[in-house]
Amino acid sequence: IKRKWDGILIMENNKDKKTDDILEKLVHINRITKVVKGGRRFGFSALVVVGNQNGKIGIAHAKAKQVPDAIKKANELARRNLVQIPLREGRTIHHDIFGKDGAGKIKMRAAPKGTGIIAGGPVRAVCEVLGIRDVVAKSLGTANPHNVIRACLKALKKQNSPKQISIIRNKKIAEIIEKRG
């Protein structure tokens, strides 16, 4: 973000930064209004996704009077709330998953190597910071980025690795991987 001489903010096109092995992606900025006795007070809210591109992810939403402050606040909050998500071969999800949050629904499918990230806006940001390189995802219901991201995170948390499934079913890992398509 650059400041012109007359105080007007100019946003740079680069919405993602990489600092100390954690990639930060700005998903959504919104102007918010608080109506008070003397009139309206304007501020900004920012929705940010951070991750180490190796299975760790954090999401946060923060508000401030200025855009850079809101982004900085959200980045700090997201870094404090990192969670580990298991990845298959470090590039995709283990199995097909479905997540729901409010009216936001998401379907995600594991994809063969070289497929890439076939997903829209907020889901693509989640996949990129998480380190998922091959996935097919479809967002259903609302287009609200807050609900879509939370639905995506819920879906990712629900997935089980072959090791977890083998413990639950009391079978060997080889038997479970053998049936995988």
Predicted features and spans:
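Ribosome-associated RNA-binding proteins
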Residues: 5-181
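Hydrophobic alpha-helical membrane-insertion segments
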Residues: 1-3
